[in-house]
């Protein structure tokens, strides 16, 4: 389900829609909610994002919900792959502990090691997916 208030003209919309289609093809229920400018002042926030209440992400607007679990997609704009990945994780983890990042050319081994280092530093990461073109790959899932 895509909310009618979403700006469908952005490149970000197309990337997130690609992610949504990936999960929907697996038979999962996918919701693409709108971004709300000032969530805590918007009465629709609790209706749409109410499941975030009581979490560190309450007041945030993650990009999509898959089977009642929130995911955040992040892209990049630098030429340095390691900087790109670091920035995507940093921004994504502000919205959700399940993130989808654009492929920046790093190996799966590097990505997994980086996630383990972040977890040892106390960051909560439940899933990491990499999107390359129209394909999503699960790199890490917490047990």
Can you say where each PLM-predicted feature lies in the sequence?
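Conserved catalytic cores of phosphodiester-cleaving nucleases, focusing on short active-site segments
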Residues: 64-75
């Amino acid at each position: 389900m895509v909310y009618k208030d979403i700006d469908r003209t952005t490149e970000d919309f197309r990337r997130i829609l690609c992610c949504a289609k990936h999960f929907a093809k697996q038979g999962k229920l996918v919701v693409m909610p709108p971004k709300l400018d000032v969530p805590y002042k918007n009465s629709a926030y609790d209706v749409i994002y109410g499941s975030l209440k009581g979490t560190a992400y309450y007041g945030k607007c993650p990009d999509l919900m898959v089977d009642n679990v929130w995911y955040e997609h992040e892209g990049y704009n630098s030429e340095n792959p390691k900087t790109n990945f670091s920035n995507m994780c940093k921004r994504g983890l502000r919205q959700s502990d399940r993130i989808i990042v654009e492929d920046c050319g790093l190996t799966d081994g590097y990505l997994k090691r980086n996630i383990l280092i972040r977890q040892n530093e106390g960051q909560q990461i439940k899933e990491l997916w990499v999107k390359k073109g129209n394909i999503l790959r699960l790199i890490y899932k917490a047990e």
